[in-house]
Amino acid sequence: HTAYRRQRQMCIRDSFYSQPRMFYRSQTPIEQAHIASAIVFELSKVETPYIRERMVAQLLTVDETLGKRVADGLGMKPVPKPIEPTVPVQDLPLSPALQLIGKAKPTLEGRKVAILVADDSNAEMLEKYKAAITAAKATPFIVAPKISITLNNGETIAADGQLAGSPSVLFDAIVSIIMPEQAKKLAKVSEAIAWFKDAHAHLKAIAYCGATDEFILIPQHIEKDASVVALKEIETFIEKAKSREWDREPNVRDLA
C-alpha cells in the first residue's frame, strides 16, 4: 500500500500542470476564452491580492497565454513570474474529445423556438414557421403581448405564453412576426426590448420581419449577422437555430 501511494503521488505530481495544459490547449478558441473569463470572474471575488497573484503564477505555468489573459482581465500589474514546477511540464497530445462546442452536433431536436405574434400578425407566415420548426423536431411556442390575439385572417388564437412571462432565455431561438403598429407599441415595452436584446446577447438565431427591424432591431443597435435573418429566409433560420452564433460573441461581451 505504501508503494502504491508513493506511485500515485508521483503521478499526481508529474501531471499537476501537464494535464491542465493539455485540457486547455485541446479546447476551441471560444472555449479557451470562456475558461479564461470564468477564472477572471472567480479570482475577482478573491479579496487577498497574494492569492490572486499565486493563482495567476500557477496559470502561467499551465499555459503562458492563459495566464496572461487572466492577468490582463484582472488588471494585474506587474504580472507575476510563473511557478517553477518540481518536474518538467509535458506537452501531452491534444484531445478534441475534451471539447464541448467543437464536437457538438447542430440540431433543433428536443428544443423550443419562440414565435412572437400580436394582433394582425400574418397567419400564413405563422403556420409556415410552426411547420418548419415541427419538421426539425423542435417545439414552436407562441408568445404574444396578450394571451388572446386575432391574426390578419380574422382567426383568434391563444398564445402559449404572455410576452412578459416568456423571456427569450427560455428558448433556443426566436421569430418575430408583428405588424408596424404592434412593433411601435412593443418598442416602448422594456420586456419586449429585453426579449430581443437577450436573445442576441445569448448568441441565438433571430428571424425578424420588416416592422421588427425598423422599430426594434435598428433602434436598439441589434446588429445583423449570419444568424439574424429576414423572416422569409425560413430554411436559413432553421439551420442557424441548430447552434449558437459564436462569431457574434466578441461583439456582445468582453471576453478575457
PLM regions with names:
Residues 23, 27-201, 215-256:
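Extended, subdomain-level signal for the structured scaffold at the beginning of enzyme domains
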Residues 212:
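A generic "binding-loop/recognition-motif" signal
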Residues 202-209:
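ADP-ribose/adenylate-binding Rossmann-like module
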Residues 14-19:
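Short acidic (Asp/Glu) and glycine-rich catalytic loops that position anionic groups and cofactors
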Residues 1-4, 8-12:
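Single conserved hydrophobic/aromatic residue that forms the stacking wall/gate
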Residues 4, 47, 209:
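Single, functionally critical "micro-switch" positions that shape active/binding sites
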